[in-house]
Amino acid sequence: LKPVLWRNPKEIPNNGIDDDKNGYVDDYFGWNFLGGKDGRNVKEDSYEAARLYHALKPKYGGTVDESKLSAIEKEEYRIFKKAQGDIEHGSTEAQSQVLFLRSLYNKSSIADSVLKEKFKPEYNGNDLVTFKPANSKDADAKSTMLALFRGFEMMDATNDFIIKEFSSYFKGQEKKAEASQIAPKDYRGEIVKDNYYDFNDRFYGNPDVMASTPFHGTHVSGIIAAARNNGIGVDGVANDVRIMSIRAVPDGDEHDKDIALAIRYAVDNGAKIINMSFGKSFSPQKKWVDDAVRYAQSKGVLLVHAAGNDGKNVDSTENFPNPNIADTKTKATNFITVGASGDPKTGGLAADFSNYGKKEVDVFAPGVKIYSTIPGGNTYGFAQGTSMASPVVAGLAAFILSYYPELSAEQVKYCIEKGAQNPNTQVVKPGSTTKEDFANFSRTGGLLNAYESIKIAATLKGERKVLSNPAPQPKPKVNKSKKG
């Protein structure tokens, strides 16, 4: 990734001076909106539903006469009731699982330790199948870890990755279990120390874009732009790309102010495509994000967003950010929402965790067993989620723009959507056991098809003013039987 990282040409790194006078000191590689001026960084955070539930509970937790509420209060009450339903139902459900998950996590950790000693320090599920246990203890360890690999449907992943994934899931369920009883800690406020509710207080954070939780961003970045054809690790989707690193999402739900300012920062510093591999079910300061989306649209910047991993229909379940501009009831034209397609060899064309929606999801792209860069120095691993599908689309958008820079954001979106391939088959609907036409899961009804999208791009007359020379026209040798 090092060769493809964006570097701010107007900033001298580590000199303690805001050389480009944009308000962000030493933003050479980008900016961290989750940092404090003292160098500390926000690592984890709470769920937005929990934040809203506990903030509004003193006002709306008892008996409420809706007829006496103002319009603003009615909207607050609606949000509270929705958050209350999510938190109280989710908490009850999680509480029933936590004891079992804690026991299974402890058992899995012990099993992994046994296998590291008796088998080998690093192994994947396929390796483990070949292990010959010498006794019942070893056999139990093998059985426990194999169940975990198969449960995550990632037999190619390493043992350390699987244990880490399970730990993350277990801790998330613990948070949900306690959410109805305990008000969440203000992780962000204790470190960032801005006036959160003043949008003009925007020059906060620090330049430490790696911070303490770089796995997700590193994996996503590699999918888009890992250096190609160097014989090392993986090839990103696109050449001639620079990754501008902006940290605005913790291990937990992001805050709307950070997202809005991150979008504006990217636009102001020349980004043409913004990948957004994050999301949540509540957006109390949606207007700030909507304004940033409109700002990006006015500057010709394409936004690519992950649809989410709840196995839900987002036509009827809210998911943020989204292209729906609340105050004008219009839809942003520079916004693509991406669902995750699965591995046909192991399950189906739609990943079982992916959100979907005939109106709100635009296209599906690969999001299961995606191999990419991870922190650690030329280290690689698997991950899955719509967070992995979104950068596949962002990478294709970057590829198209690198050869056809005169195309507008809307034209690139058109190429991607028009080129999507409808498999004309029924698949298991995410989050269920019933089958439906794959075409019902998105606006295009299709899977991303790079070959077709690039062919369409070649036919369009661009609408964007070009300030630099385009890349040479591609002349790939395409095996049409394997296109897409």
Stretches with model-predicted labels:
Residues 38-39, 230, 249-253, 279-283, ...:
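Solvent-exposed loop/turn segments at secondary-structure junctions
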Residues 211-214, 235-238, 253-275, 285-305, ...:
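Mature extracellular/periplasmic domains of secretome proteins
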Residues 209-221, 308-310, 379-393:
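Gly/Ser-rich catalytic serine loop of serine hydrolases
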Residues 301, 323-402, 406, 447, ...:
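Extracellular S/T/G-rich loop segment that most often corresponds to the catalytic His/Ser-adjacent loop
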Residues 1-255, 327-334, 356-360, 403-415:
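Subtilisin-like serine protease catalytic core
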Residues 267-269, 273-276, 287, 333-337, ...:
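C-terminal subdomain of the subtilisin-like protease fold in secreted/lumenal serine endopeptidases
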